């Protein structure tokens, strides 16, 4: 399985082409639209989300509600493009129109300046448009297809926010997977403690008035993955490493950890390692899950626990100082539309990116020309793991 995305933030559309999806997977536009709507939601989103109503168009690879095994083409139209017809025109335009929305004061924390240097851009909008988080629309669309595969194999997942702009979400007692999932899904903030909703919303409103932004830490949990996915035989086959790369590829993500993560640096080995158990009904298990479901780059059969840290959004309504790329004089950075926070949306993106990596690993590991073939191979493997 592989995919490519294309499109600019204010261009006419965004596109993804996915190759390697088995034939016979039940797939409808509504499956993808559901994830796209989740990405657009959450408290703190800005004006762009009131303009766009993301809906996918499937133009290949699906017929009568089933995948055919051919490449799948997904497209999402950018409604906001109608206001940017001159600025984002494919053909040449008058010089005055070119200068209309030219970006020459790069924003600290964005790809503007370095992208302009790398690709020799006189107008930093050429870097801004593609590096925008709008691109993640299509990674969520691809992830929605991946989640359909995982669901057919009995794999489920969730995400929730652990730290919201410096406020730690308090979890007073251990919640089951289903309890975490339900609470996060019914929260505008993707948090599992409803008593903290108003406190955080008030904080977001305060940050917005100040023209500032906040980040936080997101946790994604995956249930139902058997032991043995990934491999230790080469560095690039380790599944946790693949997930780390994928999570860090999400806009504004600056760190990733598994299980208790960086806290391991403060603990002894006897406190960190997960003791092994075995029962006739369940097979192998672990007393704990400090390592987040991974040993030696492979899944252990425990829930996968992946955490990602998102920096505050770099576009500020009270912009930081920058430099004019023509005169090299100090200037305030360019201001584009922005949100005080996009943590709930980033959680949806992270969840779908993780789903894509897991689906790809499964499709590469098991016979997967058709869904029925994949389901049998996966079921047989589960049975083998249980009786090992």
From Swiss-Prot:
Pathway(s) served: Metabolic intermediate biosynthesis; chorismate biosynthesis; chorismate from D-erythrose 4-phosphate and phosphoenolpyruvate: step 7/7
Matching Gene3D superfamilies: Chorismate synthase AroC
GO MF, any single term: chorismate synthase activity
Cofactor remark from the record: Reduced FMN (FMNH(2)).
TM annotation in the entry: none
Binding positions for NADP(+) per the UniProt entry: 39, 45
InterPro entries linked to this entry: Chorismate_synth, Chorismate_synth_AroC_sf, Chorismate_synthase_CS
Superkingdom of source: Bacteria
GO cellular component, one term: cytosol
Reactions this protein catalyses: 5-O-(1-carboxyvinyl)-3-phosphoshikimate = chorismate + phosphate
Cofactor(s) needed by this chain: FMNH2
Function of the molecule: This reaction introduces a second double bond into the aromatic ring system.
Protein name as catalogued: Chorismate synthase
Organism of derivation: Streptococcus pyogenes serotype M28 (strain MGAS6180)
